């Protein structure tokens, strides 16, 4: 049976910026946007911590500023003596201390640097998969035909996906989500829809699987699929 893996690097541009600053991409409030332009500029990426406040991945900068302002108004009402004692862009610190003001980092885009990191990650995939079996869908997403490799490595598709994702995390600090399917479509849908509904592991990794039967059971009536 054919087996395909789709891997998406989590909030890639934002994660690269966090790692460059020695920060945890899953715990840091950061957007990638050129603040030298107007606040109507589009954010190229938003970290998961900031998305939890309802900010979409491609928000305009003024939407981020407005959301943060509203969150801080709520936090101020709950803060001791209704005043802030400081600010933080770290989700864990904000959760522990209600007297901290929500802050975020705005990182100027570095497209050439993102390409370098993407290439480095692609080279990690090449340790396990031949280039003809890797389709680069975008700077942060690939499709892999793993069919001919499972017997070679004596592993399941999920084990192979997890091994590659773990090495990417260890060497770049960037985590990922993966979908596994018996065709490219099912792998993509498993990643985009099913993986979002399952709990992440300790590294923020989610891996979901779909075959024709489980697709009918879970998603036959699901809309939209893209």
Task: Show the residue positions of the predicted features.
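Gly/Gly-Pro- and Ser/Thr-rich, intrinsically disordered tail segments characteristic of DNA damage-repair
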Residues: 1-226
